Amino acid sequence: MDTVSKLSRYAASIGSSVRVIGEPKTIDNDLGETDHCPGFGSAAKFIATAFTEIACDCFVYDVPSVTIVEVMGRNAGWLTAASALARIEGRKVPQLIYLCEKAFDEDRFIEDVNEALKKENNIIIAVSEGVKTADGNYVGEETKSGKEDVFGHKYLSGVGKYLEGLVGEK
């Protein structure tokens, strides 16, 4: 709604009779008191389809593999959770899902990966970009660069790459 506010103020400052109205929507599905935000349904379907396609690629190989997919969601894990809708040949995809609403524990993550690899040769992991440790720090935090989007939010990225390194180490 920040953009709507700016446009409205600009129109008023130049004496325009244009009235600007905002329709709140977000594919993150994180608007309070809203069951499903406009845009979330199609984004959730896309995520589920993307994970199905990723599984098609991963499951053809006999070599054990761990595929980590970082999904948009700084403060709401709805899109990451939508990955649970993916299925291929009756198999659950992804096998592991980590949401930003629950504190992330690296040791538990490694245990989960090892347990999943005992059951299946290829595993797929969905992780929200905004997962945090119990002390509130972003996992694989790359916000230290100071870069921000046009709304002043620090860019988040790197959780997938960080977890890749963690899996490789252990």
Give the location of each predicted region:
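Acidic/polar active-site rim loop that often engages polyanionic ligands
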Residues: E23-H36, D62-P64
